[in-house]
């Protein structure tokens, strides 16, 4: 009987501890924030370099008057129409465009890109182009200069546009179809 008590005591203690609720362990974080700080500093330098390069291009291009958008890209009207309607969310626009690098080398021709149909703010396209189209009227041809963060960003387009590459888009807005409520 004496040998039964220790076994019973061990069994009861195992039973009691196994029935208790398990406590979640917190992950141990050793992050000092240096990676984020370095990344922020690197992006600030990149943005400043792009801004300097874009400003040089704008200064040399005296044929056009450039405007800076609230979204951080530049644009100039190569052909300004007399229309007064801007596309708004839900409208369907048809446009042609070509993409060059900052030095005028063609990355994608208008023939490669073909005419595009875009549902304003309802489809996913490059952020600069999404915002730029809303500044255009039917018949406008606009030259947009997009810093990399408004273009294809860190990843590029995985084809011809490289990492953190600023680009120039020549866009012609052919048509705006206003969405009609049903």
PLM-predicted stretches and their roles:
Residues 1-19:
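Sec-dependent bacterial lipoprotein signal peptides
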Residues 19-182:
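Cross-family detector of peptidyl-prolyl cis-trans isomerase
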